[in-house]
């Protein structure tokens, strides 16, 4: 892996900003690379809530670009954020989930041939409970209004009818993490934009420098509309999903003929398959094979994403055929991760204890007393019952 000393600043900047949807304050990055002539320090944070899904391949390909550009990359396992987000991760399981996320991220990166020796993992609670951090939370809460905090977390924190106060603390902590992790830049999905702006606008008021922000596009979910989400099982494909289940989910995914705008499958090819192929085989390499049945024209290989996208738009590539290719490609990506999980006891324990399967409680039906009539000894006479019922009437 190249270091900043051997990577040309322009080449490094190109790698850092490649395939991103938006960059805030790019001049900060250029100043570090061209003027200060040092490694760019950045972090990517993830809250260990639901099980990671295939959408995580998008930030993983960017971590690969950052490392190739010589960046010092920190992965923040934001355990307290997971707890604060409407208690998506209860405290008794959050430590196991953080470990599960760490092992999953390492497995993904290894599966796409990315060296991870220079990757640093930090658990949020290791510094977020210190006196200095706590005091800065108080200082920041004395600057940021309730409305600003709520708006900042609107696209990230789970929205409910009666929101908890924790949802307002969440974006303040994410802003402060930039200072306490000592970075020049924070990377995240475009859904984080409002939190990034909150950090830019308010950290200088505490005497801290403004950071740059990098945003990747969000991979659409399998259903129509919405993003792939760890907390919505119907929108995602789990990284440990069995091959048959992957095909079943892909076959039921929304995919309208000729529609290239609202197409989660094409987006997955564009933002996951294509970048991974470039990582493995070099720049501009693209080869997408579809094992199409002979009666529909036989197998076909596309040599560029644009060619494939145009074929779908012109309805030369049908939704069923696209689904065949995407399901096969996903299963090929997931196989080494499944294998690593199967051979790693620590990985399995983190999964078992982080995501315990609730055992349904069998409720015993209350036995109804049999009506034995009025003949058996001690039975209440029918006319006596009628009298008592009459007495209870208001």
Curated annotation (Swiss-Prot):
One of its GO terms (molecular function) is mRNA binding. Residues 348-394 are annotated as: Disordered. A motif ('KMSKS' region) lies at residues 227-231. Changing residue 43 to G: Decreases catalytic activity for L-tyrosine 400-fold, but allows the utilization of 3-iodo-L-tyrosine and other 3-modified tyrosines as substrates. Inhibited by N-ethylmaleimide and p-chloromercuribenzoate. The modification N-acetylserine is found at residue 2. One of its GO terms (biological process) is tyrosyl-tRNA aminoacylation. A motif ('HIGH' region) lies at residues 48-56. It comes from the Eukaryota. Residues 362-373 have a biased composition (Basic residues). Keywords: Acetylation, Aminoacyl-tRNA synthetase, ATP-binding, Cytoplasm, Ligase, Nucleotide-binding, Nucleus, Phosphoprotein, Protein biosynthesis. Its EC number is 6.1.1.1. It is found in: Cytoplasm; Nucleus. Gene3D superfamilies: HUPs, Tyrosyl-Transfer RNA Synthetase. InterPro entries: aa-tRNA-synth_Ic, Rossmann-like_a/b/a_fold, Tyr-tRNA-ligase, Tyr-tRNA-ligase_arc/euk-type, Tyr-tRNA_synthase. Changing residue 171 to T: Decreases cell population growth. Disruption phenotype: Inviable. Present with 2710 molecules/cell in log phase SD medium. This is Tyrosine--tRNA ligase, cytoplasmic. The lineage of its organism: Eukaryota, Fungi, Dikarya, Ascomycota, Saccharomycotina.
């Amino acid at each position: 892996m190249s270091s900043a000393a051997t990577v040309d600043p322009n080449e490094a900047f190109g790698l850092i900003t490649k395939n991103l949807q938006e960059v805030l304050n790019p001049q900060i990055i250029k100043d570090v690379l061209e003027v200060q002539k040092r490694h760019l320090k950045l972090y990517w944070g993830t809250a260990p809530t639901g099980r990671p899904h295939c959408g995580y391949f998008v930030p993983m390909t960017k971590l690969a670009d950052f490392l190739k550009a010589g960046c010092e990359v920190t992965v923040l396992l934001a355990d307290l954020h997971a707890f604060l987000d409407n208690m998506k991760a209860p405290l008794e399981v959050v430590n196991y989930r953080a470990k599960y996320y760490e092992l999953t991220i390492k497995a993904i990166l290894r599966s796409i041939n990315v060296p991870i020796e220079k990757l640093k993992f930090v658990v949020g609670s290791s510094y977020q409970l210190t006196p200095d951090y706590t005091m800065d939370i108080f200082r920041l809460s004395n600057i940021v209004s309730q409305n600003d905090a709520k708006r900042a977390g609107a696209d990230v924190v789970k929205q409910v009818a009666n929101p908890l106060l924790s949802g307002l603390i969440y974006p303040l902590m994410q802003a402060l993490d930039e200072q306490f992790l000592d970075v020049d830049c924070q990377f995240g999905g475009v859904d984080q934009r409002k939190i990034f702006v909150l950090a830019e606008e308010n950290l200088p008021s505490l005497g801290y420098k403004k950071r740059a922000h990098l945003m990747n596009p969000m991979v659409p979910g399998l259903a129509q509309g919405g993003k792939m989400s760890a907390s919505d099982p119907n929108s995602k494909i789990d990284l440990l999903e069995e091959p048959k289940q992957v095909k079943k989910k892909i076959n039921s995914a929304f995919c309208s003929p000729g529609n290239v705008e609202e197409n989660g499958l094409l987006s997955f090819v564009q933002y996951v398959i294509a970048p991974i192929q470039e990582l493995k085989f070099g720049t501009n390499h693209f080869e997408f094979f579809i094992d199409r049945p002979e009666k529909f024209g036989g197998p076909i290989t596309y040599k560029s994403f644009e060619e494939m996208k145009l074929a779908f738009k012109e309805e030369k590539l049908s939704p069923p055929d696209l689904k065949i290719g995407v399901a096969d490609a996903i299963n090929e990506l997931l196989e080494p991760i499944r294998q690593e999980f199967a051979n790693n006891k620590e990985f399995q324990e983190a999964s078992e204890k982080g995501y315990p399967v609730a055992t349904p409680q069998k409720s015993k039906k209350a036995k109804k007393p049999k009506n034995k009539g009025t003949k058996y000894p001690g039975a209440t006479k029918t006319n006596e019952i009628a009298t008592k019922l009459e007495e209870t009437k208001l």
